[in-house]
Amino acid sequence: MALRLLPFRQYDEQDVVNLFALTNAEALESTTGDGVGSNGVFVKVADGNFDQELISYGSNSYLGKTDYPFVNSDMYPTVQLEVTAADSGEAPLGLTLNQTAKTDENGEKLIYNTTKKEELQAVLPGQTVPVATKGIFTLGKNALAGDSISAAGITVGAGFEVADNGEISGVSATTLGMVIGTGSRTSSGGLTDQFAGDYVVIKLG
């Protein structure tokens, strides 16, 4: 599942940057996958050149076949300013609030179902992805280095930093913010919890 952010969060829209798209190569093929196209990923600026056209138009296989002879072609808009997953030792802009994905769990293209796209907390490849720079957020195990609190070295009251692929790990100093709580979720009542495992609550900024 391409969601690393759990529902509990507190942030101000003034602390959200809506300028950058995730690099196309990092977009998820499906919302059932997990990767740097998920939400809750710490990202850095990959392209911040404001001298270029902010939106470009071109052919894109995501639209299907677009080069029929003697027929006008469809052009796909893409935001040129881009972010990419931050790695260890790099300064992140913030963490993504939406996933970037092409299709839903049934393989249906999200470009044709805007309502479902919103329900899945997704944006399309090339669309701006909201990036939070400050606030309180709950991150699932797939946002932690090593997929667990112990492997990531997370300690309540201590700081955290960016690990590889936009995940986080614990540090003694409050580098990016502070870990203010931890917990774990389990499946129960015969129902599968898609967020089962460790989770942490962080104060960013």
PLM regions and their residue ranges:
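Surface-exposed, low-hydrophobicity beta-strand/loop segments enriched in small/polar/acidic residues
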Residues: 1-205
